[in-house]
Amino acid sequence: MIYKVFYQETKERSPRRENTQALYLDIDAASELEGRIKARKMVEEHTDYNVEFIELLSDKHLDYEKETGVFELTEF
């Protein structure tokens, strides 16, 4: 399952929508909830990012992300 993780680069400042960035993770999980938990844990273990939201991408949404040219899987 591919998850899109929205985050701020630092936990030091209050989140601002203008500074929100995203990364994509391929997570092996039995359910959407388990995938979200694994994604959050993975990001928190490998970065200092402030995770705002984690979204499971549907096939159509994933196709759209690939078409826009911003899609790139992140590996830790």
From Swiss-Prot:
It catalyses: RNA(n) + a ribonucleoside 5'-triphosphate = RNA(n+1) + diphosphate. Keywords: DNA-directed RNA polymerase, Nucleotidyltransferase, Transcription, Transferase. It comes from the Bacteria. GO terms for biological process: DNA-templated transcription. Belongs to the RNA polymerase subunit epsilon family. NCBIfam families: PRK13667.1. This is DNA-directed RNA polymerase subunit epsilon. It comes from Streptococcus equi subsp. zooepidemicus (strain H70).
